Curated annotation (Swiss-Prot):
Reversibly transfers an adenylyl group from ATP to 4'-phosphopantetheine, yielding dephospho-CoA (dPCoA) and pyrophosphate. Belongs to the bacterial CoaD family. GO terms for biological process: coenzyme A biosynthetic process. Substrate binds at T10, K42, L74, R88. It catalyses: (R)-4'-phosphopantetheine + ATP + H(+) = 3'-dephospho-CoA + diphosphate. Its cofactor is Mg(2+). It comes from the Bacteria. It comes from Erwinia tasmaniensis (strain DSM 17950 / CFBP 7177 / CIP 109463 / NCPPB 4357 / Et1/99). Homohexamer. Pathway: Cofactor biosynthesis; coenzyme A biosynthesis; CoA from (R)-pantothenate: step 4/5. Keywords: ATP-binding, Coenzyme A biosynthesis, Cytoplasm, Magnesium, Nucleotide-binding, Nucleotidyltransferase, Transferase. This is Phosphopantetheine adenylyltransferase.
């Protein structure tokens, strides 16, 4: 039986922490769908189409990873993708409570959907998309924290 997992997120922008998680998840599961959420309430810097295109470029070297944009409820998206696992990154203990609530709600909505939590490699444990945007807006150097295509797009946007 093959296992298909979904790694969902807004990925605005995708960071090396995200890349670390999806790369390790790709070794654990047969197929990974990197699911880029529309998330209009978060007022993303990049459009859904731009985020999908950037993610595709960043994970092109991972043959078992597909990138798909979505705006549906995550559990419904998982059903449509015939996936039974959600991969989520946990940077700190502070992330756990919220992630646990999400996992329980997703399990309630789709009883065959399990959540697997991966901690990023230590050098990425403090990175977040919002932090990268904030630091970059104020002239800080975030190049080492972002995949090259994402860094280029972020610099061009600012």
């Amino acid at each position: 039986m093959s296992t298909k997992a979904i790694y969902p997120g807004t990925f605005d922008p995708m960071t090396n922490g995200h890349l670390d998680i999806v790369t390790r998840a790709a070794l654990m599961f047969d197929r990974i769908v990197l699911a880029v959420a529309a998330s209009p309430s978060k007022k993303p810097m990049f459009s859904l189409e731009e985020r999908v295109a950037l993610a595709k470029e960043v994970v092109a070297h991972l043959p078992n990873v597909d990138v798909v944009g979505f705006s549906d409820l995550l559990a419904n998206f998982a059903k449509a993708q015939q996936a039974n696992v959600l991969v989520r990154g946990l940077r700190a203990v502070s992330d756990f409570e919220f992630e646990m609530q999400l996992a329980q709600m997703n399990r309630h909505l789709m009883d065959t959907l399990d959540s697997v939590f991966l901690m990023p490699s230590e050098q990425y444990s403090f990175i977040s998309s919002s932090l990268m945007k904030e630091v970059a807006r104020h002239g800080g150097d975030v190049e080492t924290f972002l995949p090259a295509p994402v860094y280029k797009a972020l610099k061009a946007r600012l």
